[in-house]
């Protein structure tokens, strides 16, 4: 059986998740990228609880972007997730790229979150 691109992402994600673990002091910033949208969550893995979330499906974001599948949308989500995290008192996170390569939309989200004040 030939591996598809999706299979490769899933394999990489399993490898990454063995090493990346979020605590209450330093939660995990998880990124999921689909063909049409991008999603980001700040997760405390010890409590198995999502602390903060943002995606291109939200009304406030959707009205300001043309498409949820480009770097501009990722930059906005990165800024938004950082802003919401800082409001909740979360300054340090562990970045989980979700099996995707650190390139393009994932990289744009990460850099925007760093510029907005998150430390990782």
UniProtKB/Swiss-Prot annotation:
UniProt superkingdom: Bacteria
Q: Which Pfam families match?
A: Ribosomal_L18p (PF00861)
Give the CDD domains listed for this entry: Ribosomal_L18_L5e
What Gene Ontology terms for biological process does this UniProt record contain? translation
One GO location term (cellular component): cytosolic large ribosomal subunit
Q: Which residues form a coiled coil?
A: none
Signal peptide extent: none
Keywords associated with the record: Ribonucleoprotein, Ribosomal protein, RNA-binding, rRNA-binding
Task: Please name the GO terms that the record assigns under molecular function.
Answer: 5S rRNA binding; structural constituent of ribosome
In the record, the note on similarity to other proteins reads: Belongs to the universal ribosomal protein uL18 family.
State the NCBIfam families in the record.
L18_bact
* Role of this protein: This is one of the proteins that bind and probably mediate the attachment of the 5S RNA into the large ribosomal subunit, where it forms part of the central protuberance.
Subunit composition and interactions:
Part of the 50S ribosomal subunit; part of the 5S rRNA/L5/L18/L25 subcomplex. Contacts the 5S and 23S rRNAs.
Q: Please report the name of this protein according to its UniProt entry.
A: Large ribosomal subunit protein uL18
């Amino acid at each position: 059986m030939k591996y598809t691109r999706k299979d490769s992402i899933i394999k990489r994600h399993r490898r990454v998740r063995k090493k990346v673990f979020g605590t209450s002091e330093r939660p995990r910033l998880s990124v999921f990228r689909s063909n049409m949208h991008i999603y980001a969550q700040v997760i405390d893995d010890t409590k198995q609880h999502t602390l903060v979330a943002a995606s291109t499906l939200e009304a406030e974001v959707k009205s300001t972007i043309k498409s949820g599948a480009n770097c501009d949308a990722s930059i906005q989500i990165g800024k938004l997730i950082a802003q919401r995290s800082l409001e909740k008192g979360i300054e340090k996170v562990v970045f989980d790229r979700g099996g995707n390569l650190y390139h393009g939309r994932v990289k744009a989200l990460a850099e925007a979150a760093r510029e907005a004040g998150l430390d990782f």
